[in-house]
Amino acid sequence: MNLLIMGLPGAGKGTQAAKIVEKFNVAHISTGDMFRAAMANQTEMGILAKSYIDKGDLVPDEVTNGIVKERLVQDDIKEKGFLLDGYPRTIEQAHALDENLADLGIELQGVINIEIDPSKLVERLSGRIIHKETGETFHKVFNPPVGDYKEEDFYQREDDKPESVKRRLEVNIAQGQPIIDHYRAKGLVHDIEGDQDIDLVFQAIDTVLSKLQ
């Protein structure tokens, strides 16, 4: 099976990706792992990517797309198929992926889209607090500190504050929605309700993927 998984930050995409890989034995292609491997193996695109990263520059799309293409021709993909996680991030990358898959004779079979109301994600993502003395991490709702603590004993990182989280989600929605629309027009998108127990989310994914096998 050849799949994409999509979802906003905090939607549980990483957790579900791991479960899909374990159950369906597909190769997990995550952007970070792919870049690290390409640079470590000094592939043509890996060397190019490193030259940008070393200068502190953003890696251009054509290099990112090239790294993905290099990964897609490897033996484990031919044997098992893949789950792409964290790519494409823009509609331009989605078009490049379509072209690369067509060049390689690979068919994309499904896009798993984990959906959660963004306002609930703000609560999930902005609840993290850190104890000033110990550095221990808690969550205001899901893992509150127990014991003789005061509010002033904790601090919150700037990018965990609600306004920062909202801005981050807005950027992700603006970039991600055109990609989902693009694949929905091809009949590939399977929407999964993400605001439920982790096992129930996977149950829904499992039902979809079992039909695609």
Curated annotation (Swiss-Prot):
Pathway: Purine metabolism; AMP biosynthesis via salvage pathway; AMP from ADP: step 1/1. It catalyses: AMP + ATP = 2 ADP. Belongs to the adenylate kinase family. Gene3D superfamilies: P-loop containing nucleotide triphosphate hydrolases. GO terms for cellular component: cytoplasm. Its EC number is 2.7.4.3. Its main location: cytoplasm. It comes from Streptococcus suis (strain 05ZYH33). Residues 127-160 are annotated as: LID. It is found in: Cytoplasm. Consists of three domains, a large central CORE domain and two small peripheral domains, NMPbind and LID, which undergo movements during catalysis. The LID domain closes over the site of phosphoryl transfer upon ATP binding. Assembling and dissambling the active center during each catalytic cycle provides an effective means to prevent ATP hydrolysis. It holds the Pfam family ADK. One of its GO terms (biological process) is AMP salvage. Residues 30-59 are annotated as: NMP. This is Adenylate kinase. It comes from the Bacteria.
